From Swiss-Prot:
It comes from Sus scrofa (Pig). Residues 1-32, 460-506 are annotated as: Disordered. It is found in: Nucleus. One of its GO terms (molecular function) is RNA polymerase II cis-regulatory region sequence-specific DNA binding. PANTHER family: NUCLEAR HORMONE RECEPTOR, THYROID HORMONE RECEPTOR ALPHA. The lineage of its organism: Eukaryota, Metazoa, Chordata, Craniata, Vertebrata. Zn(2+) 2 binds at C91, C97, C107, C110. This is Thyroid hormone receptor alpha. Residues 1-52 are annotated as: Modulating. Zn(2+) 1 binds at C53, C56, C70, C73.
Length: 506
């Protein structure tokens, strides 16, 4: 007698049950366990505990096509509509199958009819193009909410207090009054001719070469730039209140860093140049061959990274103050006082950044990282230069001379002048040599006698002056002219973001 086929053979869903083994019960049991395990994670909060699918009675995972269903019935309904499969479904038992989580894969037609009966909407099933468009819209909404959240968080961040505004005004005025060419540096700059600094001609003892013509050009502008850094520091009350010994140590430590920062914020990506002292635009190789060595690479890379920040004069000024009041300089006497001063500038800096409301995500921590890069690039960029004179800086000795890296005081200056045979004519920050008439000394002597080297006094003392007194630019016509050009208004409380990026300069 012919056996009546069981309901299990009625058209099953090949996508859900394609790997059935001959032992149907065992396979279904494993499938149920797998589904239960995979769906045991996130459950929407609007569902009751252990709420069941309205189609098959399995554990529901949310609203799908207007009904509370499980993942299996959601997928079955979506595939059926997208591929237009329901006209091909059939039932061997007159559409009388009972659909539950055990039998749901045994009859596609009855399962689909139950989906329709409980209210699942066919019009909510999207084709591939509509589904892609919907996902894109979802991503756009998420991005919009993220930006709105960022704006709300910016509005809630603290802005400068009245006391901090006073600190900000002083630092900004100190920077602008010692900032050559001000915000007009692009209009007033002159490009160093391409033939200068491109062909190193003087060999150094360490094997590197220096272009004397480029070195001569840098000498003319870097020496006044050092004086401007000193003048900037002296205009900060917190700095002026420190002992002279600490002032000297801080200036020796930060001079190169501040000058590098002032040059970096005047990086021009169009010409790939840095503008030194607000007047001379130089290329990377020109700066390198002029005596700065590998440090020039660090300054150019810093300029490229800072160009995206669009810093204004106040932000450059506060960043310089943070670099100046650094407690990691060895030999400081008033470490606690300097640390408190730096914290005050850091807090004012952070609040001013909040006030400007930059559109760059995480602007403040990123800017602090750049501040550390200024220091680390100067301290460690040249570490790979094996045993180069000038230590880990990677700066040639004559480059250190120009940048005021090693400042010696009055009696030492006169002693070195006598060693060079030019007593009384060489002043200011000079390189402290280990022995008379070293190769580096002979090069300095050659440069000085050629009229190339002319250093200003930045920090010195003699028998007739107060010990450790710092020279001022009050009588320097060049610096006075620079100060007269600083006509931009200081930021008000709250100030208007003046926005011309790259406000700093040597």
């Amino acid at each position: 007698m012919e056996q009546k086929p069981s309901k299990v053979e009625c058209g099953s869903d090949p996508e859900e049950n394609s790997a059935r083994s001959p032992d149907g019960k065992r396979k279904r049991k494993n499938g149920q366990c797998s589904l239960k395990t995979s769906m045991s994670g996130y459950i929407p909060s609007y569902l009751d505990k252990d709420e069941q699918c309205v189609v098959c009675g399995d554990k529901a995972t949310g609203y799908h096509y207007r009904c509370i269903t499980c993942e299996g019935c959601k997928g079955f309904f979506r595939r059926t509509i997208q591929k237009n499969l329901h006209p091909t479904y059939s039932c061997k038992y007159d559409s009388c199958c009972v659909i539950d989580k055990i039998t749901r894969n045994q009859c596609q037609l009855c399962r689909f009819k139950k989906c329709i009966a409980v209210g699942m909407a066919m019009d909510l099933v999207l084709d591939d193009s509509k589904r892609v468009a919907k996902r894109k819209l979802i991503e756009q909404n998420r991005e919009r909410r993220r930006k709105e959240e960022m704006i709300r968080s910016l509005q809630q961040r603290p802005e400068p207090t009245p006391e901090e505004w006073d600190l900000i005004h002083v630092a900004t005025e100190a920077h602008r009054s010692t900032n050559a060419q001000g915000s007009h540096w692009k209009q007033r700059r002159k490009f160093l001719p391409d033939d200068i600094g491109q062909s190193p001609i003087v060999s150094m003892p360490d094997g590197d070469k220096v272009d004397l013509e480029a070195f001569s050009e840098f000498t003319k502008i870097i020496t006044p730039a050092i004086t401007r850094v000193v003048d900037f520091a002296k205009k900060l009350p917190m700095f002026s209140e420190l002992p002279c010994e600490d002032q000297i140590i801080l200036l020796k430590g930060c001079c190169m860093e501040i000058m590098s920062l002032r040059a970096a914020v005047r990086y021009d990506p169009e010409s790939d140049t840095l503008t030194l002292s607000g007047e001379m635009a130089v290329k990377r190789e020109q700066l390198k061959n002029g005596g700065l060595g590998v440090v020039s690479d660090a300054i150019f890379e810093l300029g490229k990274s800072l160009s995206a920040f669009n810093l204004d004069d106040t932000e450059v000024a506060l960043l310089q103050a943070v670099l100046l009041m650094s407690t990691d300089r060895s030999g400081l006497l008033c470490v606690d006082k300097i640390e408190k001063s730096q914290e005050a500038y850091l807090l004012a800096f952070e609040h001013y950044v909040n006030h400007r409301k930059h559109n760059i995500p995480h602007f403040w921590p990123k800017l602090l990282m750049k501040e550390r890069e200024v220091q680390s690039s100067i301290l460690y960029k040249g570490a790979a230069a094996e045993g180069r004179p000038g230590g880990s800086l990677g700066v040639h000795p004559e480059g250190q001379q120009l940048l005021g890296m090693h400042v010696v005081q009055g009696p030492q200056v006169r002693q070195l002048e006598q060693q060079l045979g030019e007593a009384g004519s060489l002043r200011g920050p000079v390189l402290q040599h280990q022995s008379p008439k070293s190769p580096q000394q002979r090069l300095l002597e050659l440069l000085h006698r050629s009229g190339i080297l002319h250093a200003r006094a930045v920090c010195g003392e003699d028998d007739s002056s107060e010990a450790g007194s710092l020279t001022s630019s009050d009588e320097d016509p060049e610096v006075c002219e620079d100060a007269a050009q600083a006509t931009q208004p200081l930021p008000e409380a709250p100030p208007r973001a003046d926005g011309e990026g790259g406000g700093g300069g040597s």
